[in-house]
A protein has these predicted regions:
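Bacterial N-terminal signal peptides
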Residues: 1-8
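Predominantly soluble domains enriched in secretory-pathway, periplasmic, or organellar proteins
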Residues: 8, 12-175
Length: 175
């Protein structure tokens, strides 16, 4: 009997996943109840309806109240947009540079780390932006390698990692 209760408790929880469709300027919210997956919401994102702005990276803050989305292609620059998880409405945004791609939020500091995967022009050294999500302002840019992609924080939130695709370098940033 106890096994059934544990099984039921574990598998009766609903899980939500946010999925960005980069070529369609939409984000789908998927709900998994332990048995099936259904789309509960489809959110149109971007600023200009006639331009593909490319939603790319998504992260949810530790409180679960907000989610953040990078619009990688932008006009002329990309941005990070802050949304409410309650109604999936945009709350604020910060314009960044060319092609902000992957994004993570530190559970320790609450800061956002945004990696630039610049596909425009010559391959050159890129950056990771540190953004204050409360005020949606860029605090600093940290120089990395050429075309960094991927963004991960250590489980304790102390370090941010990204890899520069063109140089094969791994960058560790004190978060």
């Amino acid at each position: 009997f106890l096994s059934f209760l544990i099984f039921h408790t574990v598998f009766s929880q609903d899980y939500y996943v946010y999925v960005a469709a980069e070529s369609d300027d939409q984000v789908s919210v998927l709900k998994f109840d332990g048995k099936e997956i259904i789309e509960t919401d489809r959110i149109s994102v971007g600023i200009m309806p006639t331009e593909n702005e490319g939603p790319h990276g998504i992260t949810i803050d530790p409180s679960g109240k907000y989610w953040y989305l990078t619009l990688a292609h932008g006009s002329p620059n990309g941005s990070v947009v802050k949304y409410s998880t309650e109604n999936n409405e945009p709350l604020s945004k910060v314009e960044l540079g060319l092609f902000p791609a992957t994004i993570q939020i530190s559970k320790k500091t609450g800061l956002l780390y945004v990696v630039y995967f610049n596909l425009h022009g010559l391959m050159k050294t890129s950056t990771v932006s540190v953004v204050d999500p409360e005020y949606m302002v860029e605090i600093t840019k940290i120089k990395t390698g050429i075309m960094p992609h991927g963004s991960r924080l250590s489980p304790d939130g102390n370090f941010h990692y990204s890899v520069a695709m063109m140089s094969g370098e791994l960058f560790e940033i004190d978060a």
